[in-house]
Amino acid sequence: MKRLLVWLSDLRVAIVLLLLIALASAVGTAIPQGDPPTSYVDAYAETPWLGLLHGEQVLQLQLDHVYSSGWFLGLLAWLGLALILCSWRRQWPALQAARRWIDYRTPRQLSKLAIAETITCPDAEAGLTQLSAVLQRQGWELKPGLNRLAARKGVIGRVGPLLVHTGMVLLMLGAVWGALAGNRLERFLAPDRTLDLLSPRGDSQLSITLQDFQIERDPAGRPEQFRSLLALSDSETPEEISVNHPLRHRGITIYQADWALAAIGVQIGRSPELQLPLQTYPELGDQVWGLVLPTRPDGSEPVFLSLESEQGPVSVYDSDGSALTLLRPGGPAEEVKGLPLRVASVLPASGLLLKRDPGVPLVYLGFAVLLLGGGLSLVATRQLWAVASDGQLHVGGLCNRNLAAFAQELPLLLQRVVAREQHDSPQSVQSS
């Protein structure tokens, strides 16, 4: 059991787990997440993903929902356990050890430290007092003794690794909570249509009505921005959302995710305007909508109407695929199959993405703790001891970070002590 705990808390195991989680996240970014199963089968039927995985294998490996898959959550749990064990076995004892005072009593003990210096002075005890005063002004914590001194600075840096581990655990807990308890809903909503969100008991939680939807396009006709004006059932003021500017309301985040064409208004002959639903035709292109429209009362002699934007034009094709004419929304009628056909309007639809993720506050807290711990980890923990003996002041020190800089600062510190001596006797500095 002890060997298992030692292995789980090994830093190398945590690094391997982090790499696996990063690799899994990259896969989740490369493969679309949350689409219908048939879309993966169709997408990877002829061209397997990376030349290895067909659609069925993608589904079997749960790569269509990586972040909520059992194996991904298992990796997060394993990493969380490894971090907790590492903190318990390594970081917590290191913090406790840093908080304990070590009492070095003899010059011989100091000479074995990573940094050691000795100055010769007529009054070593006065030099010890001067050293204590200099260190106190620099913010060191002191513990004086009989003819000796212990000092430390930056012990708070030892808290940094613990906070880093705590932040990572909180972050992973928030991610798991969001994956298990969160909800995601994608819907296309036409203007003046309402989307009702129901609780598990069937009660209405929130109603969202699309009051207006605008598509901003560049001079070439490419969409640049989408804007939706939403009316919420529990709010008197409409809220506008756009790409990269979502709405957060009662724990639900509403994103402007996409757009589509919902319906087309046509007039055949002297008929009133007929609003007919459009459907997508992926075989004709990524963003092609259309419908089959009969031109006779018995449903015969149909024509096919297709368009790529709400601005048109609307292409009209015969049943054999030959082009008949082009129609502009709101423009004049054109004769098709002996009847005047006019496109009165095209109704766009707003693609809304609704997310409820209860783990987000925990994720934010985890990031904050992680950043705080990372900052504190940069603080070097320095320890210094001094012993006055036989007209000499022996000084030694340890540092867990940037030892070379501390080794350069220690002689300068001793020079300040020497400069404050009130005696005129010669002094020398020797490296031990």
Swiss-Prot record:
Keywords: Cytochrome c-type biogenesis, Membrane, Thylakoid, Transmembrane, Transmembrane helix
One record GO biological process: cytochrome complex assembly
Compartment(s) where it occurs, according to its Swiss-Prot or TrEMBL record: Cellular thylakoid membrane
GO annotation, cellular component aspect: plasma membrane-derived thylakoid membrane
InterPro entries, alphabetized: Cyt_c_bgen_Ccs1/CcsB/ResB (IPR023494), ResB-like_domain (IPR007816)
A Pfam family annotated for this UniProt entry: ResB
Topology term for the membrane: Multi-pass membrane protein
Keyword Thylakoid: yes
Complex formation: May interact with CcsA.
Family: Belongs to the Ccs1/CcsB family.
Protein name in the entry: Cytochrome c biogenesis protein CcsB
Upper taxonomic lineage: Bacteria, Bacillati, Cyanobacteriota, Cyanophyceae, Synechococcales
